[in-house]
Amino acid sequence: MLELIEVNGTPGSQLSTPRSGKSPSPSPTSPGSLRKQRISQHGGSSTSLSSTKVCSSMDENDGPGEEESDEGFQIPATITERYKVGRTIGDGNFAVVKECIERSTAREYALKIIKKSKCRGKEHMIQNEVSILRRVKHPNIVLLIEEMDVPTELYLVMELVKGGDLFDAITSTSKYTERDASGMLYNLASAIKYLHSLNIVHRDIKPENLLVYEHQDGSKSLKLGDFGLATIVDGPLYTVCGTPTYVAPEIIAETGYGLKVDIWAAGVITYILLCGFPPFRGSGDDQEVLFDQILMGQVDFPSPYWDNVSDSAKELINMMLLVNVDQRFSAVQVLEHPWVNDDGLPENEHQLSVAGKIKKHFNTGPKPSSTAAGVSVIATTALDKERQVFRRRRNQDVRGRYKAQPAPPELNSESEDYSPSSSETVRSPNSPF
C-alpha cells in the first residue's frame, strides 16, 4: 500500500527580482558526429497531451510593451521588449506555457508562467526546482534561458525542444538498430554524468522526459527535462519518489539513497530501448508485485526478443541494474563501456523490432504535434510531482528481500569540464541516431 506525502523540498533564497542577465542560448551548431545524440507504473507527464493547445502562428503585429494575457495577468514589459510572446501552447495544473520568439535573433523558446496564487505554502518546491535549473548548462539538458520574478507570477524562458520524446523517436523511425540505442544512451549518460558532477540527482529519468533535439544538419540528440524531483545530494536521501517502472531498489527499501538511482533508471530505459518492454513488470495495477521484482533485481533476457542483441549490451545493462549500489556502474563507467563508445557494437547490425511492443506495453499513441512532448515537460512543475512521492508501508520482510544494503552516498567526483556557462556541444565517437 502507498500513501502520498509531500516532497522534502529544501527552502532556498528568494528568487531574484528580476534577473536581467541572460543565460547563453543553446548552441545552434549541428554536429554531424553527435550520438543519437497520476502514478501509473510507467508514468507520463502530469499535463495531459490531449489537452495541450498548439499554436501554429503568432500575431505579427505584436510589438514591445506590457501585454495582457488571456489568462488575466500582465506579461511584464521586460519580457515583451525582448521576446514576442505568442499564444498559449500548454496549460498545466500550476503553469501556463506560451510560445515566444527572441526579437533580436528570431530564436523560438517557450515562456513558462507560474501563477503564485496556486503555489501558496509550497513556494519552496518551486524555488528548489528553479535553483537547480539555474545551475545546469549542458547540451543534453533542457535549458533555462532567462527568468523574471514579479509579485504575482514567475516567468521562465525555457528552451523549446520540438522533436518529440524518446518513444516518439523510436516508434516513428523506419530503421532502428543497436547503434541507435547506443547513441541514445550516450546522450543520457552524458547528461547524468554532468548532473552528478554537481551532486544533483534527477530522480525521475524516464522516456517521457527525454526530448529529441533536431539539428540543422538532420542529426538528432536527446535532452533531459523536468527537474521537479531533482535535488542536491549532501547525504542519504529518504523520500520515496519517482515513476515506479524506473525506481531503484534502494528507494523502495527506504535505506537511504544517492546519485546512482539515476543509473538504475537509465538501465531500465536501455533495456526497453532494445526489446520494447521493461525488465521488471507488475500485474495490472499491483505495484507491490513490481516493487518486489525490483528489490530482487533479477534481470532476464528472454528469447526470442533478445536473440539478436549483443552480449556487450546485455553486460552493460546488468552492470547498470545491480542492486548493490557500490557495484553498480557510475555514469563515467557507462560512457567508458565498449557498447557506448563504439568498440562493442556488432558489425552486422540487426534491425530491432521494438516500436510495436513499446506502443502496446506503454500505450503510446499519436500526439497532437511533435512539439507536444516538449511543451508537456515544460508545463510540469515540482508541485505536479506530489503524486509521484509515495511511502511504502513496510512489510516485515522488505529489508530481508533487499539483499544489498547501499553504502551512504558519497559526494561524487565524476567531474567534467562543463561549467554552467559552457555551450560546448557533446560529441560522440559514433554516428548520430
From Swiss-Prot:
It is an enzyme of class 2 (transferase). Residues 40-57 have a biased composition (Low complexity). GO terms for biological process: axon extension; axonogenesis; brain development; central nervous system projection neuron axonogenesis; dendrite morphogenesis; forebrain development; negative regulation of protein localization to nucleus; neuron migration. Signal peptide: none annotated. One of its GO terms (cellular component) is postsynapse. Residues 1-74, 388-433 are annotated as: Disordered. Its EC number is 2.7.11.1. The modification Phosphotyrosine is found at Y213. It comes from the Eukaryota. The modification Phosphoserine is found at S23, S25, S27, S30, S40, S45, S46, S48, S57, S69, S419, S428, S431. The keyword Endoplasmic reticulum does not apply. Keywords: ATP-binding, Developmental protein, Differentiation, Kinase, Neurogenesis, Nucleotide-binding, Phosphoprotein, Serine/threonine-protein kinase, Transferase. SUPFAM superfamilies: Protein kinase-like (PK-like). GO terms for molecular function: ATP binding; protein kinase activity; protein serine kinase activity; protein serine/threonine kinase activity. The active site is at D204 (proton acceptor). InterPro entries: Kinase-like_dom_sf (IPR011009), Prot_kinase_dom (IPR000719), Protein_kinase_ATP_BS (IPR017441), Ser/Thr_kinase_AS (IPR008271). Residues 59-71 have a biased composition (Acidic residues). Residues 83-340 form the Protein kinase domain. SMART domains: S_TKc. ATP binds at I89, G90, D91, G92, N93, F94, A95, V96, V97, K112. The keyword Iron does not apply. It catalyses: L-seryl-[protein] + ATP = O-phospho-L-seryl-[protein] + ADP + H(+); L-threonyl-[protein] + ATP = O-phospho-L-threonyl-[protein] + ADP + H(+). Residues 388-400 have a biased composition (Basic and acidic residues). Belongs to the protein kinase superfamily. CAMK Ser/Thr protein kinase family. CaMK subfamily. Probable kinase that may be involved in a calcium-signaling pathway controlling neuronal migration in the developing brain. May also participate in functions of the mature nervous system. This is Serine/threonine-protein kinase DCLK1. It comes from Rattus norvegicus (Rat).
